[in-house]
Amino acid sequence: MSMNELAVNIPLEHMSNVFGQFDVYIRKIEKTLGVTVIVRDDQLKIIGNEANIKAASEVFTQLYELSRRGNVITEQNVNYALSLLAEKKETSLVEIDK
């Protein structure tokens, strides 16, 4: 199986909110989606198969958008974003927050 990489930018001021205390949300996303996430400065490098890195990128992008809007990210937000992906729902976490 071929491994791919995708870079996602998350501004430094949102990282602790998006990643959770001690990066707990990163670990949850890694475990659930079977990817590896490496953080360097304001960039995430997501490594895995193409479908999984795309899914992880979507989750991180949604969490960042919530953070940018001033929300405190919770484990429930992460779980919900992951469940929307699993159910292949067209609705995003960000749309629900409107």
Each model region followed by its residue ranges:
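A positional/architectural concept
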Residues: 3, 18-22, 39
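Short amphipathic alpha-helix segments
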Residues: 13-33
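Interdomain "pre-motor" coupling segment immediately N-terminal to P-loop NTPase/helicase cores
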Residues: 38-97
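Short glycine-/aliphatic-rich beta-strand segments at the starts of folded cytosolic domains
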Residues: 1-17
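Conserved residues at beta->alpha junctions
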Residues: 9, 20, 50
